[in-house]
């Protein structure tokens, strides 16, 4: 028996990726329902070779739903996720609404799949921030070997992390530069075309942005609360894939060669690291791929036990949609949920 799956936010960047990945990975679904706001009702979206007609979220009956993949933002999730869970579905939420709730597991399957069983408290599992997801996938095998003390990370985050309107703004502004037209910034605080913006999300009282705060708190919750982390998050004029320049200090000795071998054998990781021109991965190459790519692995001579590296991943896939579906697969494969209903 397959599962009845609802995708909420099916017309957005991540929602569309979710539908595509469900089909790609042949997720055992008897029924897939595409849901969005009332203004998107009737829009067609792709699910593999099939076309689904989007239905309105507010009118949907979730009593027959087993798994709900939620990607409609925090406000919608806060309103609907508890209702959907109360109807008997497991909600896997991509927003930040539930990540910091102690009763809601925050899951990256390659890192802390065992914690997924905690969904029974609220009926909700949280997906981490896109930048956190790829970071902890790479950190996990290194932490297991040498115990991480401190991480310093600078992110280079693509505009798709801010939604379709942000991608449209980069395209429009880039075209305007070449046509010598006026450039208007709407989605970002400054123009993004041919520029970098060292602000993602709002500023907090201590000078960090909320995006930077998310990376700190989420890494601690997923991997180890003892890890110290500081982040600088930057928006860059790239459509898809996030990059991270990471320096790590360990409690125990570990060499670049040892790290390279560990990462080559770690789930979800793909090492591309040749010390020659082009011997690394860029955001262009990672787009559309599932792996977390690690390059530029090297010893950091500024600390006793240190490494530096370059991490790249498709933020719409591992950073969002793929991770959510891997969580659903984890629930199924570990028999944490049972398909109790057949599609009507």
Q: Where in the sequence are the language-model features?
A:
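C-terminal active-site/capping subdomain that shapes the small-molecule cofactor and substrate pocket
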Residues: 227-344
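Oxyanion-binding "anion nests"
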Residues: 192-239
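A glycine-rich, Thr/Ser-enriched phosphate-binding loop motif common to dinucleotide/cofactor-binding enzymes
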Residues: 123-134, 207-216, 221, 319-323
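N-terminal Rossmann-like NAD(P) cofactor-binding subdomain of oxidoreductases
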Residues: 1-192, 228, 256, 261, ...
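Helix-loop-beta segment of a Rossmann-like dinucleotide-binding subdomain
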Residues: 119-126, 195-206, 309-311
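Generic solvent-exposed, charged/amphipathic alpha-helical segments
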Residues: 19, 216-220, 260, 264
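Short acidic/glycine-rich loop or secondary-structure boundary segments that cap or lie
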Residues: 161-164, 204-207, 238-242, 256-257
């Amino acid at each position: 028996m397959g599962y009845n799956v609802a995708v909420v936010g099916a017309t957005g960047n991540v929602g569309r990726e979710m539908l595509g990945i469900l089909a790609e990975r042949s997720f055992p679904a008897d029924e897939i329902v595409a849901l969005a706001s009332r203004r998107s009702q009737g829009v067609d979206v792709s699910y593999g070779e099939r076309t689904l007609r989007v239905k309105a979220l507010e009118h949907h009956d979730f009593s027959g739903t087993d798994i709900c993949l939620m990607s409609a933002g925090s406000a919608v999730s806060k309103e609907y996720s508890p209702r959907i869970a109360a109807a008997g579905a497991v909600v896997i939420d991509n927003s930040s609404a539930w990540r910091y709730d102690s009763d809601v597991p925050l899951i990256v399957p390659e890192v802390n799949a065992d914690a997924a069983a905690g969904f029974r408290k609220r009926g909700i599992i949280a997906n981490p921030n896109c930048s956190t997801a790829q970071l902890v996938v790479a950190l996990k095998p290194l932490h297991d070997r040498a115990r991480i003390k401190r991480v310093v990370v600078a992110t280079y985050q693509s505009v798709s992390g801010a939604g379709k309107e942000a991608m449209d703004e980069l395209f429009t502004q880039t075209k305007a530069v070449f046509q010598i037209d006026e450039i208007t910034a709407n989605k970002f605080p400054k123009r993004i075309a041919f520029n970098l913006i060292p602000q993602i999300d709002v500023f907090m009282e201590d000078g960090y942005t909320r995006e930077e705060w998310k990376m700190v708190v989420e890494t601690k919750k997923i991997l180890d609360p003892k890890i110290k982390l500081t982040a600088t998050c930057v928006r860059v004029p790239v459509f898809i894939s996030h990059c991270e320049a990471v320096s790590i200090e360990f409690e125990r000795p570990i060499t670049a060669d040892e790290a390279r071998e560990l990462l080559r054998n770690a789930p979800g990781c793909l090492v591309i690291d040749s010390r020659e021109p082009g011997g690394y991965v860029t955001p262009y190459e990672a787009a559309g791929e599932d792996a977390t790519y690690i390059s530029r692995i090297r010893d950091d001579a500024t600390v006793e036990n240190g490494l530096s590296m370059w991490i790249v991943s498709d933020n719409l896939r591992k950073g969002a949609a793929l991770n959510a579906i891997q969580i659903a697969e984890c629930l199924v494969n570990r028999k944490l949920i049972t398909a109790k209903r057949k599609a009507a």
